[in-house]
Each structure stands twice: as C-alpha cells, then as structure tokens.
Amino acid sequence: MREVLTLQARYNQFANDNMLKVLETLNPSDLQKDVGVYYTSIIGTFIHILEADIAILLGIINSYAPNPLDTKDLQDALASGLQNNNFESLITLRKQADRLIIDLVDSIADFSAVRELSFPGISFKKSIAQYFLSILNHGTHHRGQIAAILDIMNVPNDFAGMLGM
C-alpha cells in the first residue's frame, strides 16, 4: 500500500507543480473571477484543495503517525484563513504541504489501521489507507475542475498526466 500511496502523493506534487506554472501566468483577476463553479473561482478551488490537504491529511491523519510531522506553520495558516494569503504565499504553502504529505506516507506504520474521522453531522470508520486515497483523489478531482476552467478561458494546460512524471 505504501508504494501506491507514495506514487499518488508524488503524482499530486507533480500535478500541483505543473498547475502552478500555468496559474502563475494568469492575471490575478483571472484567478479570482467568478466562473460559476462550487468554489466560485480558480483560486477558490485551489484554496479548497489545500485546505483539505492541510486539515485532513496533515492534521487529523498526521496525528495517527507514530511520530507526527511538524505541520505547525501550515496549521497556523489554515487557522488564520488561507483566503487571507496572497498567491505567492499560497504557492509556498502548497509546495510545503506536498513535501510533507510524501513524508507522512513514509512515516505511517500501519495503513490498515481503522480510525474514526468525524465532521459535523457525519463520521466515518475507515482504514488510514482509504483516507489517504480519498483525499489524494480529492485533489485530482478539483485540479480537473481548474483544468476545465482554463480550457474555457482558452489557457493551454496539461498538468494532470501521471505517465508524464
């Protein structure tokens, strides 16, 4: 399982890096433009992916590691509201999160261990591996939304191919 999760985490890092290269070419107004998606804009969707990675993987799941990683900077940024950061700061946080997620996969001793994960109104009892797969795939889903927005804006993009790693 570790090999699969490491591959997926490295893929997310690769895809995020390539997505950021495209997003850095856009005007800030294009990043913030309301395009009618659930999280309103490219930047809103980008922030949502980062929030989930920090809160769930680097927050809750990290607490299940034998030696939890130091994610204080990311947790502090999340607590103060990622939307309050400029784009350059968000890029730094994204890159830091991607590195730590790979380190977290390496630090987990037992991916089959079942843990409860609760949110207001719902809770799950799943293996740590399933939580990892769910959140890593969550990023893929929302990067696909960003790619579709870029397509509609006629901005060339191709940051999602795992075989290109």
Label each residue range with its predicted role.
Residues 1-3:
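Basic/polar N-terminal segments that are highly enriched at the extreme N-terminus
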Residues 6-21, 25-76, 119-165:
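Short, contiguous alpha-helical
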Residues 78-118, 126-142:
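Acidic/histidine-rich alpha-helical segments that form the ligand environment
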